[in-house]
Amino acid sequence: MKTLDINQIKQYLPHRYPMLLVDRVLTWESGKSITAIKNVTANEEFFNGHFPHKPVMPGVLMIEALAQTAALLSFLTMGQKPDDNSVVYFIGIDGARFKRPVEPGDQLKMEVEILRNARGIWKYKATGSVDGQLALEAELMCTMRTINDAGSTAGQ
């Protein structure tokens, strides 16, 4: 079983505090799938304003956690680490549904499967769960560009 700790994750994802939303990879299979976790603590910055009386992880950050997990799978599949000359863009989302809130103390388990990779566009099926209960699901798309090509249209 292939796993990654936070130090290994930081070699593949350019995100840093407070935007790094993947804490550990439980398992991954190149070209297929990945399972990772985000430990949601009461100390998360976003809980200060979302919402002080009933803190819940913003849906957009749950999607971002899935997208980071997907990007991690792509980098691992390509055997490539990000560098100063490349950028990964999150370019699409379909069928996003939120099924339960994610609160302080929860562990968000993220499962991402590659559906396809064509013309430089990766498509994934992604889910997040807490204690075996589905919290969110979506299909995600992303692409990688060199800095010089970063303004070009996806897929070109």
Swiss-Prot record:
It is an enzyme of class 4 (lyase). Involved in unsaturated fatty acids biosynthesis. Catalyzes the dehydration of short chain beta-hydroxyacyl-ACPs and long chain saturated and unsaturated beta-hydroxyacyl-ACPs. Its EC number is 4.2.1.59. GO terms for biological process: fatty acid biosynthetic process; lipid A biosynthetic process. Keywords: Cytoplasm, Lipid A biosynthesis, Lipid biosynthesis, Lipid metabolism, Lyase. This is 3-hydroxyacyl-[acyl-carrier-protein] dehydratase FabZ. It is found in: Cytoplasm. The gene is fabZ. InterPro entries: FabA_FabZ, FabZ, HotDog_dom_sf. Belongs to the thioester dehydratase family. FabZ subfamily.
